[in-house]
Structure formats: C-alpha cells, structure tokens
C-alpha cells in the first residue's frame, strides 16, 4: 500500500513530504532553512502561526497544500 505524499510550500517553493506530519526541524532540512530564521504556518484569515523546531504540523488538517513562510529576525513579515 502506497503512502500518501503531501504537497507543501515553503516561501512559494513546492515540496513533497511522505508523512502526514512534519516538524519545524524537518522543514528546516527540507527547505534548507538555517537556524535563526523563523518559520511560520500561513493560516487564511488568521495571524501566521510560528513553527518551532519541535512543533509538529498535521498536514492532513489543511485544505490543499500547507503553506509556510520564513522570516529573518528583525525583518517585517511580507
């Protein structure tokens, strides 16, 4: 039985993930995001949710691909 692959976006770059959950640490590896750069889960109609290395995101809960953005400390969200 094949596992479902989930599409997700990090700063508009498309990735595929083979598990139904992903952590902030796994997002860093997948998207080559350096430590010190903040990761946020974009939530339509709500403020973006900060994702720590230990935060787990359930990709099955999203309608369509999950969208993440990154932001260097001290910069304004875009």
Regions found by a protein language model. Give the residues of each.
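Ubiquitin-like/PB1-type beta-grasp interaction modules and other compact soluble beta-rich domains
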Residues: 1-78
């Amino acid at each position: 039985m094949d596992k479902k692959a989930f599409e997700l976006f990090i700063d508009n770059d498309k990735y595929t993930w083979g598990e139904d959950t992903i952590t902030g640490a796994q997002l860093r590896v997948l998207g080559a995001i350096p430590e010190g750069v903040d990761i946020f889960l974009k939530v339509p109609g709500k403020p973006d949710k900060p994702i720590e290395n230990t935060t787990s995101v359930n990709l099955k809960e999203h309608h369509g691909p999950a969208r993440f953005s990154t932001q260097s400390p001290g910069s304004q969200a875009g």
